[in-house]
Regions:
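N-terminal membrane topogenic signal
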Residues: 3-20
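Aromatic-anchored segments of alpha-helical transmembrane domains
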Residues: 23-31, 98-107, 159-169
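Juxtamembrane "helix-exit" motif on the non-cytosolic side of transmembrane helices
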Residues: 31-40, 106-115
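Non-cytosolic membrane-interface motifs at loop->transmembrane helix junctions
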Residues: 44-52, 114-126, 150-151
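Membrane-interface transmembrane-helix boundary segments in multi-pass integral membrane proteins
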Residues: 51, 171-213
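Interfacial segments of alpha-helical transmembrane regions
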Residues: 79-97, 148-156
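Alpha-helical transmembrane segments in multipass membrane proteins, preferentially the mid-helix core
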Residues: 131-148
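Short, highly charged, low-complexity non-transmembrane loops/tails of multi-pass membrane proteins
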Residues: 218-232
């Protein structure tokens, strides 16, 4: 059982550290842009930096990663790592957006402006480190849920919104009337229909690639977990294991009693026991209370 807990703990640790590094690096990159008064190569510094897709995509990704952190910490505390579907979808959106940022920077902006220019300064974080780390983290450390076709369509929404806003501000409003200049150069150097017809199919392919990597990681992890838990619990007495698990957790001096239903469900799924989840939860709670070191709660009543 200790090994099962270690698997969950390692997954939580990797997800926590990768999410935290993405958040920190995005904060560094955006702060560098905000505090740069002028840049001879990029005119969108200071508050104008929020016009750029690079910055907005990284902020979205960092915000989504920040929402992952509380669930990883809770997983470390309770040994029951779980993320809601809506957070998985939000992270998927952010990762798809920064993946587009990375690929455009690498294959379009770098040949035009030079690799060193595109991947130095704040752009080292926003064009390179954050997108790559976010992709790796989501595909390999946060593959707790399988991505569906619906999830993939949702991942396209941020890029679609920015595409519409960019076109309106550049081509419809125009810089002379308070809009934006074509700082990416896609509309001034090419017929409008080319970038407009290419951006969403490209984003779709990126989202598809991320989904394939994520789901393969999910399938591998589930297969490994299934083999491990089947070997561990096939002939085991689940009732005794749940009781032992409760006794080991009861030594922790915490007031909230958290029953690890996910772990118990996995045990039941891979065992031949006739015990139900409800019965296991009752066994856990009873054993926990009988062995808990925090039974005197009178001083905590308000």
């Amino acid at each position: 059982m200790d090994k099962a807990m270690k698997i969950t703990r390692r997954q939580c640790q990797l997800a926590f550290f990768s999410a935290a590094v993405v958040v920190i690096c995005v904060c560094i990159g955006v702060t560098m842009n905000l505090t740069t008064v002028a840049d001879e190569n990029f005119d969108h510094m200071g508050l104008r930096t929020f016009c750029m897709f690079t910055v907005n995509s990284n902020i979205l990704c960092a915000a989504a990663m920040a929402m992952v952190i509380p669930y990883t910490l809770d997983g470390l505390r309770t040994h029951n790592y779980h993320m809601p579907r809506w957070i998985v979808d939000l992270v998927y959106m952010g990762v798809t957006a920064v993946a587009l940022t990375f690929l455009v920077s690498l294959f379009i902006l770098s040949p035009a402006k030079g690799f060193v220019l595109i991947f130095t300064g704040s752009r080292f974080f926003l064009h390179g480190v954050c997108p790559l780390l976010a992709i790796v983290a989501f595909c390999f450390f946060m593959s707790e849920k399988r991505l569906t076709f619906r999830d993939m369509l949702l991942a396209l929404i941020p890029v679609l919104i920015y595409t519409i806003v960019y076109y309106v501000m550049v081509a419809v409003v125009g810089e002379e009337k308070g809009g934006w200049n074509d700082f990416y150069g896609f509309l001034s150097r090419l017929p409008h229909w080319i970038p407009l017809s290419a951006i969403m199919p490209l984003t779709f392919l990126i989202a598809l690639g991320i989904r394939v990597l994520h789901n393969r990681s999910y399938d591998r992890r589930k297969a490994a977990e299934s083999a491990f838990y089947t070997a561990l619990f096939a002939d085991a007495d689940v009732r005794k294991i749940v009781a032992a698990l409760a006794r080991s957790h009861s030594s922790a001096k915490i007031l909230d009693i958290v029953i690890p239903t996910r772990v118990i469900s996995i045990m039941l799924e891979h065992s031949k026991s006739d015990c139900t989840l409800e019965e296991c939860c009752e066994i856990y709670l009873k054993e926990y209370l009988e062995n808990s070191q925090v039974l005197n709660l009178e001083k905590y009543w308000i």
